[in-house]
């Protein structure tokens, strides 16, 4: 792209991708990258916020647009500064734990006869794990198992609902400490064929393993998985 026009500004949304690989997009020539602090780089500690990183020109332009020309990064909310720095410090370890959980989930469901993407031994670009089910009820019970194995609101039963912006009903499981924190263990899916669960996050490998095994237990008891 730069060979076509060196003045083109290349921007990437790196949500779910931070610390998954050894290098980040700006090390590969991207002018600017952005992401959410309630995802990977917040380490599960940040309650809100986002970040941008890149060339000085891009950051100055973005800061001027967000606040005011001349003020740039000298203003803005700093209420979570301690959590931001502590979360960033913990983020590589937390991302590693969620990746271990994703690999465990992929291998487990492959052995149970389901398809997963990425497969357990494939290179990963982010923390999202897909599991493909044969029926909508299997998908629903998996998400309910994820919720049941969560540290918050484990008593809640996720139900499909007509979420704005979607053509089909959507089920969401997220027993998280911070609402919407995708670095925490969660799963969601549109209730349509193909029946794909999008699972992501996990503050610890143990948390993911517990939630996934809880989901399997529910599916086994309902006759959706045969382990004989």
Question: Which sequence ranges carry the predicted segments?
Answer:
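Conserved C-terminal alpha-helix-loop-beta "cap" of PLP-dependent enzymes
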Residues: 111-121, 125-227
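Conserved PLP-enzyme active-site core in the AAT-like
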Residues: 1-100, 109, 113-117, 206-228
């Amino acid at each position: 792209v730069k060979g076509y026009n060196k003045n083109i500004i290349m921007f990437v949304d790196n949500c779910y991708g931070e610390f998954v690989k050894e290098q980040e997009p700006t090390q590969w020539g991207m002018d600017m990258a952005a992401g959410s602090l309630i995802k990977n780089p917040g380490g599960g500690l940040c309650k809100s916020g986002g970040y941008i990183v890149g060339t000085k020109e891009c950051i100055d332009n973005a800061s001027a647009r967000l606040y005011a020309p001349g003020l740039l990064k000298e203003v803005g909310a700093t209420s979570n500064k301690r959590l931001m720095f502590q979360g960033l410090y913990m983020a590589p370890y937390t991302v590693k734990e969620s990746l271990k959980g994703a690999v465990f989930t992929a291998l487990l469901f492959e052995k149970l006869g389901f398809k997963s993407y990425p497969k357990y031994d494939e290179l990963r670009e982010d923390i999202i794990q897909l599991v493909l089910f044969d029926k909508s009820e299997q998908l629903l019970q998996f998400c309910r198992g994820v919720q049941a194995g969560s540290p918050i609101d484990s008593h809640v039963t996720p139900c499909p609902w007509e979420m704005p912006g979607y053509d089909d009903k959507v089920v969401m499981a997220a027993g998280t400490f911070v609402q919407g924190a995708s670095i925490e263990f969660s799963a969601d899916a549109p209730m349509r064929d193909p029946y794909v669960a999008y699972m992501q996050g996990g503050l610890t490998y143990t948390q993911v393993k517990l939630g996934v095994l809880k989901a399997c237990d529910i599916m086994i008891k309902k006759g959706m998985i045969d382990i004989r």
